[in-house]
Amino acid sequence: MLQNLQKIFITILDYVLPPRTDFAIVEKLDAEKINNLPKAQDVEKMDWIHPLFYYKDNKVRAIIWELKYKENTWPLEHIGKIFHEEIIALISDIVTFNNDAEFLLIPIPITNDRRIERGYNQSELIAKSILENDLARTLLYAPQWFQKIKETPKQSRSESRQERMSNLIGCFEADPGVDGKYVILIDDVVTTGSTLSEARATLFSAGARDVFAFTIAH
């Protein structure tokens, strides 16, 4: 009873005095609030990409910014569980018809220069939160088999999807170890799908059997 009253009080307080910083917004999120975030729309003509939440929602945007620029992983405790459930649901049909199927979990990589600049890769943090829920060890974490070998301009600075696709050509490199395996790519946000499409094409060229992608937002 007391806990319910506290939740009601916090809800009223947030309405009267809404949080003004991304940190304050993220700090107030719990499992229930994260589960109730607005769902993302499908990525047009890319049904292999599975985004969770609608990016323009202020809470979703706060999660992304806190993770990407401040390494705030608090929401991943809950988001990792959601991702894992979605992934297992997706691959269950594959396992039914192919018991020998191998599934690689690969975060979208960044270049070494970008890693030095930022200190971490937020996509790796998301992937690791998924692994923490993979108690049956269904997924093999394999970031070493997929690298970004060329820096590319930030998408927001590109004028068109065609230009973005052109900038991305040849920026990834896949290890032959992906041959014959199913790959699940992890990223924070999908906008046009250009980065994920180039990643997928590179993995297919290296022999991946199929490639899916999951993102927090779209």
What is the predicted function of each stretch?
Residues 1-218:
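Glycine-rich phosphate/pyrophosphate-handling loop used in enzymes and phosphotransfer proteins
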